[in-house]
Amino acid sequence: MRTAEITRNTNETRIRVAVNLDGTGKQTIDTGVPFLDHMLDQIARHGLIDLDIKADGDLHIDAHHTVEDVGITLGMAIAKAVGSKAGLRRYGHAYVPLDEALSRVVIDFSGRPGLEYHIDFTRARIGDFDVDLTREFFQGLVNHALMTLHIDNLRGFNAHHQCETVFKAFGRALRMALEVDPRMGDAVPSTKGVL
């Protein structure tokens, strides 16, 4: 099984993330940021990745450090669990609708971190959650999972729906990219022979 556990402690946050890339979507998530917990649940369920995440952060200031550092730590755990990338499909994509909202997410486990992020949220907050933190989460994740990630919210007027379609599509694209292709054997999906 492709599993990993990472603990990351700073002066601002204390975070532990455990992942099972070959899971069933089970999750235990407690970041102290309820909307983030809801979005991480979407990744687990739609990616069929088991997630166990516990975060304690400086929420008395705001949620920025916690959200970003959860992204960083999750990215580190995914990278560790993926390992050499032998046999990996490497690429994944998904379109996900939710009522009026539609998002597209495309992933390449290239070893080169890059984020193309295009969400024009219709409001600045979803409940207590600052929508700007969505980018911070994905930037942290991308930088440490060493993936290229394209996120496009194609339409939507309900900010909750916009965000949820992105996280669901990310989970589904991640599931596709991380699948092992039996025809690949132990080959790495690159002409370089390494990713």
UniProtKB/Swiss-Prot annotation:
GO terms for molecular function: imidazoleglycerol-phosphate dehydratase activity. One of its GO terms (cellular component) is cytoplasm. Pfam families: IGPD. The keyword Manganese does not apply. It is found in: Cytoplasm. The keyword Cytoplasm applies. Keywords: Amino-acid biosynthesis, Cytoplasm, Histidine biosynthesis, Lyase. It catalyses: D-erythro-1-(imidazol-4-yl)glycerol 3-phosphate = 3-(imidazol-4-yl)-2-oxopropyl phosphate + H2O. It comes from the Bacteria. Its EC number is 4.2.1.19. GO terms for biological process: L-histidine biosynthetic process. It is an enzyme of class 4 (lyase). Pathway: Amino-acid biosynthesis; L-histidine biosynthesis; L-histidine from 5-phospho-alpha-D-ribose 1-diphosphate: step 6/9. Belongs to the imidazoleglycerol-phosphate dehydratase family. This is Imidazoleglycerol-phosphate dehydratase. It comes from Bordetella pertussis (strain Tohama I / ATCC BAA-589 / NCTC 13251). The lineage of its organism: Bacteria, Pseudomonadati, Pseudomonadota, Betaproteobacteria, Burkholderiales. The gene is hisB.
